[in-house]
Amino acid sequence: MYIFQRNFLYYPFGKILIIPEDFQEINLKTADQTNIYAWFRPAQKGQKTILYFHGNAGNLSGRSDRFEKFATQYGVMAISYRGYAKSEGTTSQDGFFQDADSAFEFLKSKNISSKDIILFGESIGSAVAVNLASKHDFGALVLESPFTSILSIAQKTYWFLPVSLILKDRFESDKIASKVSAPVLIFHADKDYLVPFAEGKKLYELFNSPKRFIEIDGDFHIALSGDYLMKHITEYLQEKK
């Protein structure tokens, strides 16, 4: 279990089959010299940019519909984590955090300020987004089906194992949520079959910045349409002006 635990946490299956129209394919170099694949569509004048961190399964192609919707009102950048489609390296928490840092550095190189960047994290990507948001002052932090930590979920799932002693990648958003200065918007289905609703609600309570929690009636995990997300994100940002 200790040796193979990352095989249970990360599912980087599939190839990049679809690239959204007008998106650029780019390669990033991380601090540890790992090459990371990403998509980028520059923002139009006056638009903010969404920096997107996907969940633990699949790849960017499975989110292409969302990205196309977002691109009608925002610039969009989405990275393929190390170990996932077209990226080098092996999966790990610290590696993912470095991947996110490199994406932010790329946007800065395009003269995009942190306040003009909206971080979006889904599921395990929520922890990547929270980590980055705890270190810089962003325009907003949007999370879909987030959790307090992988440890919290693992303890419920593998209650018969000493997971607190053997878990390598903990993604402990609960320990750094208070450091986030950006406004926070959270979406979570009340009967989410994978990440318990209570996890998202508990994390929400730990943020000290302006925040909103949108509870959705349903038993799904990461299934909201791009239109639905964009509507609520845009409304929330308008209120925070």
Model features per residue range: what roles?
Residues 219-229:
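Catalytic histidine-centered segment of alpha/beta-hydrolase-like enzymes
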Residues 191-195, 221-223:
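Acidic catalytic loop of the alpha/beta-hydrolase fold
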